[in-house]
Amino acid sequence: MAMRGDPKQRRASASAPHGGAAHHVADKLRRHSTFLLLLLLLWFALSLYLFLSATPPPPRPAFLPSTSTPRPALRIYVYDLPARFNRHWVAADARCATHLFAAEVALHEALLAYAGRAARPDDATLFFVPVYVSCNFSTDNGFPSLSHARALLADAVDLVRAQMPYWNRSAGADHVFVASHDFGACFHPMEDVAIADGIPEFLKRSILLQTFGVQGTHVCQEADHVVIPPHVPPEVALELPEPEKAQRDIFAFFRGKMEVHPKNISGRFYSKKVRTELLQKYGRNRKFYLKRKRYGNYRSEMARSLFCLCPLGWAPWSPRLVESVLLGCIPVIIADDIRLPFPSVLQWLDISLQVAEKDVASLEMVLDHVVATNLTVIQKNLWDPVKRKALVFNRPMEEGDATWQVLRELEILLDRSQRRHVESWKR
């Protein structure tokens, strides 16, 4: 007869399966809770990322200094020349640092504080030679003389060549000079004389930063060069109301030299008679505000104008180009074949009008057509703060300003030069 088991043992063995099931359920609940917690954390992190990605950063005022200017790859060594080549000129006449040719001073000062300035010449990509040739105000008409420019630059090059090996290493090809006057490094305000003189031989392999630029070939741009804007003090953009807020009660504005009886100077006429024709055609037209006399507060007149006329003088370029953009007045450029600074940024066709010299008689009709069709579009493009900033030389340099644009153009120029060198080597 089989023996019956102990009742306690039977209860224990009977209850064992139920206790294991409870532990199994509890373990499943813990794993499920952990999974839910991880899922919740993942959802929160993803939501936060999407929110931050979709939130635009607050806009930064256009003319405030940037605190995050990227450090450009370009390394520039600035020669420390004796003061007679630069600083003495500013000390002798304060106009040297502020007039329309003062880009040579502004660029020098900006590069001295530039984050990419090379402390050692061996680390440099380019070499900047700071010579101020536009500061000799000894002439009767108040404009600077350029008669000393070639000799002063030649002295600077001789000094650089004698004291350091870098000029001789490249024959000056990696050296940068500023030529911020009428016909660049030809150093004469009259085009026929400038062409006859040409660029000094010792500068022809160097890089020139010049206000002069025309389409096609020209003796005065027969060297690697970057077209830069004429100097206008950055404060101009801050002195008057923001362009979009200005009351514009002048239709078309010009104040400057307009000869009633143009003089024949060696077979050439000032402005190719364009300014004379403007005066003859529109001098009595009430829509045109044309004045021949100087006026210290002329920029306030520009700020009140829809269109600012920018006819050529002896040279095609004019500080009116920059002043017009800064003051929100549409530049009307009357200078055939002119090349303008920083075209990829300024997009000149979108912010200005270009009228052929031969079409001055049709100017009123052209301006009326713009008013009737796309005036607001042009003004919107023109009033972009990026455009204004690109034309002023800040000291120190700010991201996007004229010096910053010059460095960008120099990088492009170097890249193009290196590609040419590689391609010639491959041949």
Swiss-Prot record:
Residues annotated as glycosylated: N136, N168, N264, N374
MF terms (GO), sorted A to Z: glycosyltransferase activity
Topology, Lumenal side: 55-427
Family: Belongs to the glycosyltransferase 47 family.
GO process annotations (BP): cell wall organization; glucuronoxylan biosynthetic process; protein glycosylation
TM spans (from-to): 34-54
Record flagged with keyword Transmembrane helix: yes
Parts of the chain on the Cytoplasmic side: 1-33
Subcellular location(s) per record: Golgi apparatus membrane
Protein name: Probable glucuronosyltransferase Os03g0107900
One cellular-component annotation, GO: Golgi membrane
Topology in membrane: Single-pass type II membrane protein
Disulfide links within the chain: none
Domain of life assignment: Eukaryota
